[in-house]
Amino acid sequence: MSLPGLELSQTSSEREFVPAPPTQITLSKGSEWRFEVAFGTAIRVKLLAGTAELFGTELAASQTYTFSGTKAAIYTWHGCTLEVSAGDTISTIDGLGSGGLNGEGARGYGAGGCQSEYTAEETPMVEYANVHFALEAMRQEAKATGKDGPRVLILGPENAGKTSVAKILTAYATKVGRQPIVVNLDPAEGMLSVPGTLTATAFRTMMNVEEGWGSSPMSGPSAVPVKLPLVYFYPLQNPLEAEGAVYRPIVSRLALSVTGRMAEDEDTRETGIIVDTPGILSAGKPGSLEIINHIVTEFASSERLYSTMMKNYDNKPTSSASAAASDERITVVKLSKSGGCVDRDAAFMKSVRESQIRTYFFGNPIPSTASAALSMSASSTTNITLSPHAQQLDFDSLAVYNYTIASSDEDEDEYDPSQFGASDTFLPGGRNDAEGPETKHAEETSFTSSVPGLGGSSGDDAASGSSAVPLKKVLPPAPNTLANSLLAVTHTAPNASPAEIRDASIMGFLYVADVDSEKGKIRVLAPIGGRVPPRAIVWGKKWPGEVVGLVG
């Protein structure tokens, strides 16, 4: 009923979104369906007939999978029929979808609301499968002779599909019962962790179709077995920062941990390692080849990169500081770039990072009918909701460290009014009277890596050099720029040396929701309850940087 003259019965200009009817897509043998879904929107995909896989992981028949903020492809070896429909609107950190649009505005005109979708007949999947079979032959030989399995290093420019190839090779390996160790050396994206981390994970089970690599342990049920990543924090976007002086020692420490795992686990030793690298290392920038050489030494596409790799490494003996010398030879193989590789702009990558951080603290907001079916839940859909614990901490009680490396692409202003007292401006050189000789001595002392056997023969290795580790303790009062950023809690003591803090693995992450400089307190979110462990904490100021809107 409507009141005369008020026109209350008229429909609102913001009409409720009405999804289009489901669309059936038939794929012929050896073809794939490529699709892009914006953040804030979702599509549902169901396999009606035949067989299909997403980055090597098979889709279960008659199960509905939900995708959001994804650029992916579903491939079929023998032909299949897919049903694609529109999903619910997914809330993001800022309430907006990709490109500043809300859920409905970001929907495209493709099947199910995809921004882009099409079927491709020509794919490089046969090449990738041949690589898998070649690796399997090497693994069988390693098992028969007692040697280490193949160590695969994937190199290529940005947006070339390196991570997709790593997923495919990992999925195929687990499908035949292998247990590869996957190493992510790209701090731009997290693997089973937040951005700004270098991780290594032993994959014993299948990967999650909807979540990519899968999920790390959490206090709740999981349809797919969780993975246990070893995490190191590298709070810089570019591995070439400070000429790799921070990146290389962390890579060495990660390689040492991986080598130790392989020495104790026969299954992973026979299967080998798959290493995914940052695309910037293949851009030909100064220092890139030195870091690639360091990665090859520790762990083991353009024409110029391919030629350089062939010249420097093809059929050369392996030389690893963390592994025993052998007569193994390095083989360089060039793979075709998939036509489905698309550029990911800065806005999309920002949404990817925010989504990974939000998922770490609050769980996956995407409702999944496939997960509900696999977990035999009573509900038709399910999504993993986590409840982080909020608490206030005295900043004086924390040992927070920050990397003091000037950004290579911007002149960052380090000024923060809360860091200065009323009379600090008038002291010689801006020095604080509270800083005694001990503080000055600690800042000027050089620390070197104490890891035996790592980088001992490389003169340019920062771990063995005499230069100081660029880690500085953040002194009270708490800087206002600490708000909306991540803190990495390490496994080392709060008074450890900068080299030990740099080389320490990560226990977990805190999100700083608010800073009260006057009271000397900060409000943080923690993934678990209880007191924050008394450990050294590294501030992710430069990377992943500020994440606004995670909490209200």
Curated annotation (Swiss-Prot):
Domain of life, per lineage: Eukaryota
Species of the source: Aspergillus fumigatus (strain ATCC MYA-4609 / CBS 101355 / FGSC A1100 / Af293)
Location of region: Disordered: 409-471
Keywords associated with the record: ATP-binding, mRNA processing, Nucleotide-binding, Nucleus
One Pfam family per UniProt: CLP1_N
InterPro entries: Clp1, Clp1/Grc3, Clp1_C, Clp1_C_sf, Clp1_N, Clp1_N_sf, CLP1_P, P-loop_NTPase
Residues the record lists as binding ATP: 32, 71, 159-164
Family, per entry: Belongs to the Clp1 family. Clp1 subfamily.
Subcellular location: Nucleus
GO CC, alphabetical: mRNA cleavage factor complex; nucleus
GO MF, any single term: ATP binding
Complex and partners: Component of a pre-mRNA cleavage factor complex. Interacts directly with PCF11.
Purpose of the protein: Required for endonucleolytic cleavage during polyadenylation-dependent pre-mRNA 3'-end formation.
Ranges of compositional bias, category Low complexity: 459-468
Originating gene: clp1
Name of this chain's protein: mRNA cleavage and polyadenylation factor clp1
Ranges of biased composition (kind: Basic and acidic residues): 432-444
GO biological process terms held by the UniProt record: mRNA 3'-end processing; tRNA splicing, via endonucleolytic cleavage and ligation
Primary location class: nucleus
